């Protein structure tokens, strides 16, 4: 197996065209060394969205072009690079994962203990027809449905805030209700 990055001595190219030029150079070297395309893991290199609004589109376009030229090549990425410097990074990371997988990415550097991200990967594979009859998804989560049905849903922070509003209303503490409602609204997203 071989991992190759689409960068050169000048750094990470801004354009898809320059990255693809590097990609074709990598393919020439792989051919010289007898490395089959199926053993290559190409990282098109995603940059942070906070400094480059085209971060996803350049990455996704590279993925699509690579998969068009060599469907058997694997595409990987350091997932959290896209969200560097942004607040609530997990939101950006999860959205990026889905969009990148749709463009052809089939592996990524992720936190294996992040259950939401792992669930997103299984669900996305099922939706993209990469999981025949959802067998992998069912195998991973089939028993979870029964377990979750038996467990009461945990209270969300919003539920707790609204309980406070309800209690203040019951107790007739009108002066405090406005602030409690505002706190609930501020923390609802």
Q: Which stretches of residues belong to each language-model region?
A:
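ATP-dependent carboxylate/acyl-activation modules
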Residues: 1-38, 48-69, 73, 80-189
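Active-site pocket-lining segment
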Residues: 43-47
